[in-house]
Amino acid sequence: MNEQEKFIPKRDIRVDWQLIAEMIKPGSRVLDVGCDDGQLLAHLTETKNVDGRGLELSQAGVNICVANGLSVVQGNADTDLGFYPDGGFDYAILSKTLQATHQPHVVLEQLLRIGQRAIVSFPNFANWRCRSYLAFKGRMPMTHSLDTPWYETPNIHFCTLKDFTALCGKMGVTIEQTVIVDASGKVMTRTNYGAFANLFGADCIFMLSKKKA
């Protein structure tokens, strides 16, 4: 495998990855769905000693992961999660991939079937920057989290903090933890965002589990 196909470890790990890592217990079994070039999976392996597996749509991404010694296979979150066994992992992670799936609610069901817990992160489309961009420019918003033009983006199902919370309620999913990050990358606390998380939050991270019968 050509050395150029390997990733260069990032000096500053993405903020949502750091926060996801904090949610995971050391030594856990982890499935990273939509793992791209494996940066998060490698970070979890190094810092939490996880037994990590990955699923990635892009063959180029899979090649980079394998070149770096990660256990990753090529597959589609919409169609291939059904091949994984019930409860095969402690955590099933979907990091900024939900909005690119065709049936987000079905993918969530699969994550919660496969993992004891699901950790999902996504850009909040109700952030004030998105609202003002659309209101004043009349064009599809482009922000730090949404940095691809509408005609090239893989994102097809944008959602907001309130949308996702409502979906979890409709599906009977337990929200164990919610972390909201503002545009500067700082974690927002209840004292500084109160009821305005949906307006000022740029990225959302949820840890979910099935409701106990």
Show where each model-derived region lies.
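Conserved alpha-helix/loop element of class I SAM-dependent methyltransferases that forms part
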Residues: 11-27
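Class I SAM-dependent methyltransferase "Motif I" SAM/SAH-binding loop
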Residues: 34-36
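Class I SAM-dependent methyltransferase SAM/SAH-binding core
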Residues: 39, 43-80
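Short conserved loop adjoining the S-adenosyl-L-methionine
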Residues: 80-86
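A short SAM/SAH-binding and catalytic strip from SAM-dependent methyltransferases
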Residues: 91-103
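S-adenosyl-L-methionine-dependent methyltransferase catalytic module, highlighting the catalytic core
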Residues: 106-110, 117-212
